[in-house]
Amino acid sequence: MYYNHKNVLDTEQFSKPDLDFLIGKIRVMERLVEQNKAFGILTGKLLASLFFEASTRTRLSFEAAMERLGGRVISTVGFQFSSISKGETLYDTMKMVEAYADIAVIRHPVEGSSRIAAGAVKIPVINAGDGAGQHPTQAILDLYTIISEKGTLDGLTVAFIGDLKYGRTIHSLINLLRHYKVRLFLISPPELALPESYKKALQGYSLTLEETTDIKAVWDCDVAYVTRIQEERFPDHKEYERLKDLFKINKELILASKKETTVLHPLPRVNELSTDVDDLPNAAYFRQARYGVVSRMTLLCLSLGQDF
């Protein structure tokens, strides 16, 4: 098939054939890594890692992905360590980055910032999270994780639990799941419900959606996607304190499930996912992080036009 996505900015850009192609290529990359044959695919290429908002997993995952492909990385972390702190615009920053690197990965607290970045340059740009907007590479690795863990997506029931209002990983993954025959449970307090714009975007697709405040809905789900309450997005800290502990996933809840509920979490976790879940075989969130490296290795290659 013809895959034509130099930039990875949001999940709306991907069709079902695109996703089928990506899943297949990630499988190929996973085998290459297992056989120690991936190193050297991007030799001579330079990645600019631009993280203007806190990150551990995504930043290290992208940098590890580039290094494992034989490429190199230059980076900046936080506004205080960049010329943006001096008043430089994101546009100007990107024009400078274009002179140094072959591809850029950017995380920024402002929704839509990745589009500004991509519009400024000719090199590929990958969105690693833009405020409460989207996190497309996380969604792709989440999709791959579910398929790897469950064998399929069609026919599954997936629960999203926690902060559905500000959770960009949820926004992105739901956009991808509309291409599959799935049933969604949205489990959150009303104050943190999925924005109406995302619900409307699901209309006309074959999935079904149900909203509830009952955490026990997890018992009927094949997958439980848990997220932390996004403290940094709340304009009112008292509101965060009131809501932060309303939904908690623990071992007792998961063991009571009618299905072998696979537990996912984009991490970091705070109080919403108990550590007593970690030793369950269906706790997949650390495997999820591992799938992230091969997924991002694949996306880096495809954005740079390098087949494998």
Swiss-Prot record:
Source superkingdom: Bacteria
Keyword Transferase assigned: yes
Binding site residues for L-aspartate: 86, 168, 228
Keyword terms, alphabetized: Pyrimidine biosynthesis, Transferase
Pathway participation: Pyrimidine metabolism; UMP biosynthesis via de novo pathway; (S)-dihydroorotate from bicarbonate: step 2/3
Entry EC no(s): 2.1.3.2
SUPFAM superfamilies: Aspartate/ornithine carbamoyltransferase
Catalyses which reaction(s): carbamoyl phosphate + L-aspartate = N-carbamoyl-L-aspartate + phosphate + H(+)
PROSITE patterns associated with the record: CARBAMOYLTRANSFERASE
Pfam name, any one: OTCace_N
Keyword Transferase: yes
GO molecular function, one term: aspartate carbamoyltransferase activity
One GO term of the biological process aspect: glutamine metabolic process
Binding-site residues, carbamoyl phosphate: 57-58, 107, 135, 138, 267-268
GO cellular component: cytoplasm
Subunit structure: Heterododecamer (2C3:3R2) of six catalytic PyrB chains organized as two trimers (C3), and six regulatory PyrI chains organized as three dimers (R2).
Family: Belongs to the aspartate/ornithine carbamoyltransferase superfamily. ATCase family.
Function per UniProt: Catalyzes the condensation of carbamoyl phosphate and aspartate to form carbamoyl aspartate and inorganic phosphate, the committed step in the de novo pyrimidine nucleotide biosynthesis pathway.
Protein name: Aspartate carbamoyltransferase catalytic subunit
Organism: Leptospira interrogans serogroup Icterohaemorrhagiae serovar Lai (strain 56601)
Gene (name only): pyrB
